[in-house]
Amino acid sequence: MNPQYLPNDGYIASTLTGDLFESLLEEGLRCENNKSVSTGLQTPDGVETCPHYGVSEENCEKLFAFLAPYIETYMEQFPYIKSIGILSSDCPITFGEPWFNLQKPNHYLPMHMHDGVLSYSIWLQLPASSEFIFSYATITGKSSDYRINLTPTDSGKFLLFPSTLNHAVHPFKSDDPNETRIVLSGNILFQGVAELINSNQINNFT
């Protein structure tokens, strides 16, 4: 007998540098002063399931420079991006504007996917116990959940994954109603023609 497993794409998990983690966390702790961002994830009565805020240009530059090599690594390890097949030739990849997610005990992120090609979630401040869930179809068409259990020791870690991979975050429990889970998320996209023509700095990911 020789069992065979069908191939699939996956995700990359790694850790921020200490300096970048401290810089992002510092801004995350005061990001309510930044512009509010709408993600479209709402409760049935039309309220966002948790607040979202923009990230400073300075931290965006640091973050994008850090993440760039991981995009190349993902493309080397998984066939997903090169198999998309909607373009006549390769094109550069660019970063969308990231955002902070602030979640208190009653907040959550329902099952959803992102725009773009790849997405990332960076855990900056975590409660005693929470989880991040991927959901995808098996080869038999059934729904399968992949759960990542998180504790404060996971602060500073991040995931890079396909944007169309469904994921969710359930509410966490805490005796402190003001305890806050801080996560930074963002998307990586194909660079549009207009942006490509007008830009003096074109990414070299192809």
Predicted regions span which residues?
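Double-stranded beta-helix
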Residues: S185-T206
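Non-heme Fe(II)/2-oxoglutarate
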Residues: M1-D90, N106-L109, F205
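Catalytic core of non-heme Fe(II) oxygenases with the double-stranded beta-helix
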Residues: I93-L165, H170, E179-I182, A194-I197
